[in-house]
Amino acid sequence: MSNFSHAVKYNVISSQLARHYYQLKNRSLKQIVFVATTGRSGTMSLVDIFNHIPHCKAEHEPYPAMFDEVLKAKCAGNEAFVANMYWRIKSVNLWRAAAGYHHYFESNHLFIKTYIEYAVEDFKDKVTVIHLVRDPVKVANSIYALQDFPGTEEGNKWWLDYTAQNNLIKIANYLDNDPEFKHPFYKGLWYWYEIEERVKDWRKKLPHVRFLDFNTEDFNNQDKTFQLLRDLNIDFDESALTEYVNTRANTRPHQKLSPPLPLEQANKMHQNFKTLLSSLPI
């Protein structure tokens, strides 16, 4: 799409008209599901499962993903830019994608970082959030293997900027200068804990929104996975979904530039990090 066509399609008036049109086409929509997670946590497994259930639709990081310049604006406190991107572009695309379905799921770890408050205002009581949690050492090691941890050019597009003033866990001085904690693995650990703090914070700010807790490791457990779907009030045929449980998706082995740290070393560093956090007034 040319810049001119994009500007016409997503100007304020066009966006308002398009949103109203797609809202009318979403009369059958019962629920829109988002995920509050770090990424590297199994969200693609959920996408695969959702897309094999009648009247359900799932997409992974659909346009606009709200990353890069949107995430950087959020980290810099430029809320006007983020709000404009949501209401002018993101909202329309969400309503369009959900049209014709009973349940729509967006798998996007940028949700908790850039646009949760706008999505809740937009979809109101239709919103459910899955708080998807993977072991912090596994998440940090996965990010470390990709070598795109916070602080790198690519990492700041997708994860978070550990130097941002609006972080809940402000330890940039340690991550930059401490002989122990300036190892890049710690930036992945910081990211995991920062996301968890943000989830806690949003749960307090949005007490009317339903959050469902789920562990990534439980995707290997058919009973727990099916219970999650029941908790989402989704009708499904267990026999039709059995083959999609226990599968791994989006492991990105071709993008991993470094071997992960040995588990013993990673666990020791995690313990060091927890000791640091416990000593700080966070």
Model-identified regions with their sequence ranges:
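PAPS-dependent sulfation machinery
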Residues: 48-123, 154-159, 163-180, 272
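PAPS-dependent sulfotransferase catalytic core
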Residues: 1-99, 240, 244-256
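Conserved phosphate-donor/acceptor-positioning beta-strand/loop module used by diverse small-molecule
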Residues: 123-145
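Short His-Asn-centered micro-motif
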Residues: 36-38, 105-110, 133-134, 215-217
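Short catalytic/ligand-binding loop motif for oxyanion handling, primarily in non-cytosolic enzymes
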Residues: 44-47, 65-68, 112-115, 136-142, ...
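Short, hinge-like loop/turn segments at secondary-structure boundaries
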Residues: 75-78, 146-150, 231-232
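PAPS-dependent sulfotransferases, especially Golgi type II membrane carbohydrate sulfotransferases
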Residues: 1-26, 168-188, 193-282
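Hydrophobic/aromatic beta-strand patches that form the interior of the parallel beta-sheet core
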Residues: 33, 57, 128-130, 212-214
